[in-house]
């Protein structure tokens, strides 16, 4: 019950008040992802510090269901300020969690994103939850 309440609070907060849903100028990388089964469309923009190999800023625009929008916002909150290789690692952990294959320790690494763990039991919503993370992982892999 406590996990479900936390899930609802995290999802609602990031959907209703997404901190990272806006446009940014002069992004180093821009990728779009679409989930045709739900109508989700996310355009992710990231800025990198190539010398430090870190993500210094990021934002997303687009439309979609509450899960896709909240999940993208949670991802950006988690990866901004992190080294690029760590962002890839976190994205891979999230995708592992959604497949119900992550350990408790790995889920703990995901901080608030761990609240979405039960999406693995909702097959129709999996594509919604992973869209932003797949785009983020692809963006970071282009910079490594």
Could you describe each region identified by the protein language model?
Residues 3-25:
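Short, conserved "active-site rim" segments that organize catalytic pockets and cofactor/ligand binding
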Residues 17-57, 62:
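Structured beta-strand/loop patches that form or line metal/cofactor-binding pockets in enzymes
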Residues 25, 49-54, 100-108, 141:
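Short, glycine- and charge-enriched coil/turn segments that flank and shape catalytic ligand pockets
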Residues 56, 60-118:
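Active-site- and interface-proximal helix/loop "cap" or "latch" segments in soluble metabolic
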């Amino acid at each position: 019950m406590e996990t479900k309440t936390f899930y609802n609070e995290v999802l609602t907060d990031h959907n209703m008040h997404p901190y990272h849903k806006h446009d940014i100028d002069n992004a180093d990388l821009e990728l779009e992802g679409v989930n045709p089964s739900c109508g989700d469309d996310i355009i992710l923009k990231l800025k990198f510090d190539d010398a430090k190999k870190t993500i210094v800023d990021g934002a997303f625009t687009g439309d979609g269901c509450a899960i896709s929008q909240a999940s993208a916002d949670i991802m950006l909150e988690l990866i901004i300020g992190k080294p690029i290789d760590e962002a890839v690692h976190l994205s891979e952990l999230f995708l592992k969690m959604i497949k119900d294959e992550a350990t408790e320790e790995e889920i703990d690494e995901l901080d608030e994103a761990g609240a979405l763990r039960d999406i693995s039991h909702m097959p129709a919503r999996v594509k919604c939850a992973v869209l932003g993370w797949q785009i983020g992982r692809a963006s970071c892999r282009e910079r490594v």
